[in-house]
């Protein structure tokens, strides 16, 4: 077995772009998702090492210090971070001439040839679900025999092997939490709406929804929700509860954990027996009966992608959600005492000044506890990217998804709505949602009830206002 380094490379200060972040950008407040995609394959390679640089405040010099310890380096990359990640790979190769190094992630899965052509020092890239592709490299198998691999042969020519079949039995994958225990400091991972410290993991891959903007189902996970067995999930939570007694919350980061409702309820009941607090992603259509089962068995929070308050925009992006159903679902959650973190996207196809106003009013009406407002990001490999090129919504001048400091930009524009108008609407959205007497009172009440929460919210407040000031500087 090759001595293998799995690396989420150093990047922008505070850049949440790891192998677990759906939107790669510097957040409004300090936030880091776990590098779960890398941890999963690290668990398949005995003796490997996982380094998640940014949350652990590691710079390039820290990584290079041990470069000669490894035979193989596997870096996770993304469209926004690719140029920076290539420079890190080149530095690793300069420090260890015998090192084989390559990339995994959605960026290289959909653009394997172009990615390899960016630097002759990139030895390989892996497509879609790369777990067993990388394991076979680490085992020393001939690269020409490994499905799902694109690579540079001994002559320097680029070769593309047949794609790897998507994994069907998710219980074949080992637990990720032992890798967290071995290689990560979990206190370094923050998500503003989750308790701290938290742990996130997947209980399945894929999503049956067809949202045009969503990256993973269109590039690496597919549109069939493939799940781990209930017993397998519960066994990992049981392990993690003992391995990390300090953890206050578990988060299931499947694209839509609630799609299989009988399974959701079965897992909930088992978690209830364990007595753990947990949260998950959900679509805004979960029946009240299922919500009650979840709530009664330890569910605290749902992360819900509302995206827009305009029904036509939801049709345009194939969200498969009705505004009236979302309203009823949200009302049920409020009545059951389930906290909601709502996410919204501005700049989607069909957006106008009027629909932005409609979405802001919708968010204020349904009133989730906290929100995230993102900008529509046309990642290569998505339907949104194809549409943007076809209709001229994306131009070279504004094609970057982030600015040089890692802040998310507004790459799309429309004949009736400019990049700048879309970008500036994010700040307006946040101000009009949070700067209301009831919302301010709720935050103060939360702080008064918990000294730990008071310290945390004060820190987040400082970071949030600094973020808004930074956005204003970008505009001016």
Walk through the language-model features, giving the residues of each.
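Short glycine-rich His-centered loop
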Residues: 2-32
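Flexible glycine/acidic-rich beta-alpha junction loops that bind and position SAM and/or redox cofactors
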Residues: 11-20, 112, 154, 209, ...
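N-terminal [4Fe-4S]-dependent radical SAM core
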Residues: 2, 143-146, 152-200
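Short, solvent-exposed turn/loop segments enriched in Gly/Ser/Thr/Pro and often Arg
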Residues: 39, 54, 105, 253-260, ...
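Radical SAM [4Fe-4S] cluster-binding motif and immediate context
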Residues: 176-341, 348, 353, 358-361
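Glycine-rich beta-alpha loop elements in corrinoid/cobalamin-binding modules
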Residues: 37, 41-169, 375-381
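Radical SAM enzyme core and accessory elements
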Residues: 1-6, 27, 47, 65, ...
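Non-cysteine beta-strand/loop elements that form the S-adenosyl-L-methionine
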Residues: 130, 291-309, 369-378, 398
């Amino acid at each position: 077995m090759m001595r293998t380094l799995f690396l989420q490379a150093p990047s922008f200060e505070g850049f949440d772009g790891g192998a677990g972040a759906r939107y790669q950008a510097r957040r409004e407040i300090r936030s880091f998702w776990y590098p779960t995609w890398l941890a999963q394959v690290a668990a398949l390679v005995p003796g490997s090492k996982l380094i998640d640089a940014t949350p652990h405040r590691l710079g390039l010099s820290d990584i290079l210090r041990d470069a000669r310890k490894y035979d193989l380096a596997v870096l996770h990359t993304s469209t926004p971070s690719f140029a920076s990640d290539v420079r890190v790979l080149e530095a690793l190769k300069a420090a260890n001439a015998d090192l084989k190094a390559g990339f995994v992630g959605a960026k290289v899965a959909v653009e394997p040839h172009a990615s390899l052509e960016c630097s002759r020092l990139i030895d390989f890239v892996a497509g879609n679900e790369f777990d067993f592709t990388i394991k076979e490299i680490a085992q020393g198998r001939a690269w020409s025999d490994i499905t799902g691999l694109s690579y540079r042969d001994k002559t320097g020519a680029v070769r593309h092997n047949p794609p790897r079949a998507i994994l069907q039995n998710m219980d074949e994958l080992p637990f990720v939490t032992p890798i967290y225990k071995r290689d990560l400091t979990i206190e370094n991972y923050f998500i503003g709406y989750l308790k701290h410290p938290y742990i996130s993991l997947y209980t399945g891959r894929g999503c049956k929804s067809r949202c045009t903007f969503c990256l993973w189902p269109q590039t690496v996970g597919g549109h069939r929700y493939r799940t781990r067995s209930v017993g397998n999930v519960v066994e990992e939570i049981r392990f993690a509860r003992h391995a990390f007694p300090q953890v206050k919350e578990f988060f299931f980061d499947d694209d839509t954990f609630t799609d299989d409702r009988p399974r959701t309820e079965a897992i909930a009941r088992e978690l209830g027996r364990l007595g753990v607090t947990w949260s998950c992603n959900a679509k805004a259509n979960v029946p009240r009966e299922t919500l009650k089962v979840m709530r009664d068995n330890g569910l605290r929070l749902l992360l819900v992608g509302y995206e827009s308050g305009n029904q036509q925009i939801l049709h345009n992006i194939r969200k498969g959600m009705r505004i009236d159903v979302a309203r009823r679902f949200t009302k049920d959650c409020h009545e059951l005492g389930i906290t909601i973190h709502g996410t919204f996207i501005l700049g989607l196809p069909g957006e106008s000044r009027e629909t932005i106003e409609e979405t802001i009013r919708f968010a204020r009406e349904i009133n989730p506890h906290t929100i995230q407002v993102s900008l529509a990001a046309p990642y290569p490999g998505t339907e949104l990217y194809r549409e943007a090129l076809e209709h001229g919504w994306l131009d070279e001048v504004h094609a970057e998804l982030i600015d040089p400091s890692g802040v998310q930009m507004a790459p799309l524009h429309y004949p009736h709505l400019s990049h700048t108008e879309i970008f500036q609407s994010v700040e307006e959205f946040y101000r009009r949602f949070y700067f209301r007497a009831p919302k301010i009172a709720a935050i103060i009440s939360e702080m008064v009830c918990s000294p730990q929460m008071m310290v945390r919210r004060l820190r987040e407040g400082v970071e949030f206002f600094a973020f808004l000031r930074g956005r204003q500087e970008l505009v001016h």
